């Protein structure tokens, strides 16, 4: 991606209109806003956390924002270029349920081994609880560990202590509240 330019090239726009759910006009608008917030064309992890803090002032979104940042940063170079940003935004804001669940699975599967372990699930659920601050939950979900236990009871069909993409997808579709919780962090 080399040197960052403030002008969006037509081939980049064409690629993004093909690869995302955004129109050329929307892409140009998002690019303008992106450059306003990130004049050098790169969004750092600290900048990303700062954005989340604006939306979740009552909690601490730092941990969750860092985890989401990792999924946005497709090439793992420590910053988010506009193309990475718009592709992730397309899925999280306009994608269909399967695309959103695939994206969420990548978020939860921190080590990218194709499974979500209890520890990985706990990591995300704990980050979400920190982000939203204290909100009343039912007795069986009032701690991150209880929430993880409940999710695994529902989703881990073969009881091997880890979730495959298929188990995650089916379990999420069977429980609309899980999908609602996912959209909390998905954008």
Swiss-Prot record:
SMART domains listed in its UniProt record: EFh
PROSITE patterns, A to Z: EF_HAND_1 (PS00018), EF_HAND_2 (PS50222)
Residues given in the record as Ca(2+) 2 binding sites: 109, 111, 113, 115, 120
The keyword Repeat is annotated on this UniProt entry: yes
Residues covalently joined to lipid (N-myristoyl glycine): 2
Subcellular location, record wording: Cytoplasm
Coiled-coil positions: none
Subunit structure comment from the entry: In contrast to Frq2, does not interact with ric8a.
Function statement: Ca(2+)-dependent modulation of synaptic efficacy. Also plays a role in axon terminal morphology.
Full protein name: Frequenin-1
Taxonomic source organism: Drosophila melanogaster
């Amino acid at each position: 991606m080399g040197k960052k330019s403030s002008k969006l090239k037509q081939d980049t726009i064409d690629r993004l209109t093909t690869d995302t759910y955004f129109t050329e006009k929307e892409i140009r608008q998002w690019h303008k806003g992106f450059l306003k917030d990130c004049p050098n064309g790169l969004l750092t992890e600290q900048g990303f956390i700062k954005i989340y803090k604006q939306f979740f002032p009552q909690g601490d979104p730092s941990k969750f924002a860092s985890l989401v940042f990792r999924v946005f940063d497709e090439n793992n170079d420590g910053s988010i270029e506009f193309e990475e940003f718009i592709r992730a935004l397309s899925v999280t804001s306009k994608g269909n349920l399967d695309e959103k669940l695939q994206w969420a699975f990548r978020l939860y599967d921190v080590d990218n081994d194709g499974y979500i372990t209890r520890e990985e699930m706990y990591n995300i659920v704990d980050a979400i609880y920190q982000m939203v601050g204290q909100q009343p939950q039912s007795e069986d979900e009032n701690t991150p560990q209880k929430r993880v236990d409940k999710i695994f009871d529902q989703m881990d069909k073969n009881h091997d202590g880890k979730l495959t993409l298929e188990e995650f997808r089916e379990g999420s579709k069977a429980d609309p509240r899980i999908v609602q919780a996912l959209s909390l962090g998905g954008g």
